[in-house]
Amino acid sequence: MSETAPAASSTLVPAPVEKPSSKRRGKKPGLAPARKPRGFSVSKLIPEALSTSQERAGMSLAALKKALAAAGYDVEKNNSRIKLALKRLVNKGVLVQTKGTGASGSFKLSKKAASGNDKGKGKKSASAKAKKMGLPRASRSPKSSKTKAVKKPKATPTKASGSGRKTKGAKGVQQRKSPAKARAANPNSGKAKMVMQKTDLRKAAGRK
């Protein structure tokens, strides 16, 4: 009898299923969404634009919009914001409305706001000048005091040397004068002796 080979199993073994990783992939630093730049504050740009105008009657709304557009502000999208900012600044007393009513008309800075801007500019210019000058005056004062202290000792020896010369000169004059006086005294003493001798001889002759 012929041997029969065992039949191959028809059942298939299922392949292992990979489980999805529970860890979330971290975002790359380069792909982080860039933040939108903050918009310009209209309440600050409007006073700056009005400070540049030299018109006494103020700046009209159309001219103000041109100045804001030149500064990089989107006037068309933010038209309503400009009008609201103008009303707020007028109510606060920062701006004065010279013509028109509401947001339409001409505007200019009030005296208080103008004086505040001038003071700020003066402080900035003073600080810039101080930086250009370099060291402050307080740091320069020790150098001047050192130079004065060095000059004073030099002046004192000159006075002492002058006085020394005067004393030496006076002593030399006295020494020179003293021999002359001695010589002048010696002849007088010799004459006195001769007179005494003559008187003695006369007396002796008279006695004889």
UniProtKB/Swiss-Prot annotation:
Modified residues (Phosphothreonine): T156
Domain H15: start-end pairs: 38-111
Any one Pfam family match given in the protein's UniProt record, by short name: Linker_histone
Annotated compartments: Nucleus; Chromosome
PTM entry text: Phosphorylated in early spermatids.
PTM sites of type Citrulline: R56
Basic residues bias: start-end ranges: 121-134, 143-154
Keyword presence, Protease: no
Key words, A-Z: Chromosome, Citrullination, Developmental protein, Differentiation, DNA-binding, Nucleus, Phosphoprotein, Spermatogenesis
Entry-linked SUPFAM superfamilies: Winged helix' DNA-binding domain (SSF46785)
Top-rank taxon, per record: Eukaryota
Biological function: Testis-specific histone H1 that forms less compacted chromatin compared to other H1 histone subtypes. Formation of more relaxed chromatin may be required to promote chromatin architecture required for proper chromosome regulation during meiosis, such as homologous recombination. Histones H1 act as linkers that bind to nucleosomes and compact polynucleosomes into a higher-order chromatin configuration.
Name by which UniProt lists this protein: Histone H1t
Species this chain originates from: Mus musculus (Mouse)
